[in-house]
């Protein structure tokens, strides 16, 4: 079960919208690996093609994932190898889409205390976020058991298929 996530932090600001996460000009495919190449392209050109983003954590400000309701946005993030997104707040539809595809996301009002390159650790089950670089610890609402099961399965569809198969 995915309980603890640890990775290098990449910082983004407030109101990162779905067009910045995966620009519409790249939506001519639904292949996650193709989408991954253009992850965050309009917010930080070339980000999705960096070698050092696998296993990393995006930390952002308010209203992450605002804009259109395209599911491609969290798919691009997950396929790029981002292990978790921490933000002060999320657009509701992005939040739901991320959970549906098994991308862990965490709301943390102190997200702005992280800096680019910090090492973060997220404990979904116990509700703790740590900035290991700065030695700080923050409490968050732990993921309920059913969300942990969705994350473990890899997303909502996979969870449902597993439940039907049992």
From Swiss-Prot:
The pathway entry for this protein reads as:
Amino-acid biosynthesis; L-leucine biosynthesis; L-leucine from 3-methyl-2-oxobutanoate: step 2/4
- Which UniProt keyword terms apply here? Amino-acid biosynthesis, Branched-chain amino acid biosynthesis, Leucine biosynthesis, Lyase
One GO term in the molecular function aspect is:
3-isopropylmalate dehydratase activity
CDD domains hit by this protein: IPMI_Swivel
Q: Which SUPFAM superfamilies match?
A: LeuD/IlvD-like
Which Pfam family, an example, fits this chain?
Aconitase_C
Q: Which domain of life is it from?
A: Bacteria
GO BP annotations, alphabetical order: L-leucine biosynthetic process
Tell me its family: Belongs to the LeuD family. LeuD type 2 subfamily.
Q: How does it assemble?
A: Heterodimer of LeuC and LeuD.
The protein here is known as 3-isopropylmalate dehydratase small subunit 2
Q: Which organism is it from?
A: Thermotoga maritima (strain ATCC 43589 / DSM 3109 / JCM 10099 / NBRC 100826 / MSB8)
């Amino acid at each position: 079960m995915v309980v603890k996530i640890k990775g290098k932090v990449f910082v983004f600001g407030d109101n990162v919208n779905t067009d910045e996460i995966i620009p519409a000009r790249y939506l001519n495919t639904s292949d996650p690996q193709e989408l991954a190449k253009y992850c965050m392209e309009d917010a930080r050109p070339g980000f999705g093609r960096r070698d050092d983003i696998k296993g990393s954590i995006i930390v952002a400000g308010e209203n992450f994932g605002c804009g259109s309701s395209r599911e491609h946005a969290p798919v691009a993030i997950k396929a790029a190898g981002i292990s978790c997104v921490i933000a002060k707040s999320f657009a509701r539809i992005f939040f739901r889409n991320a959970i549906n595809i098994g991308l862990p996301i965490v709301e943390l009002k102190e997200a702005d205390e992280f800096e680019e390159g910090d090492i973060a650790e997220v404990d979904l089950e116990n509700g703790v976020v740590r900035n290991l670089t700065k030695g700080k610890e923050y409490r968050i609402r732990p993921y309920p058991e059913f969300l942990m099961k969705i994350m473990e399965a890899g997303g909502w569809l996979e969870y449902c298929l597993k439940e039907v198969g049992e």
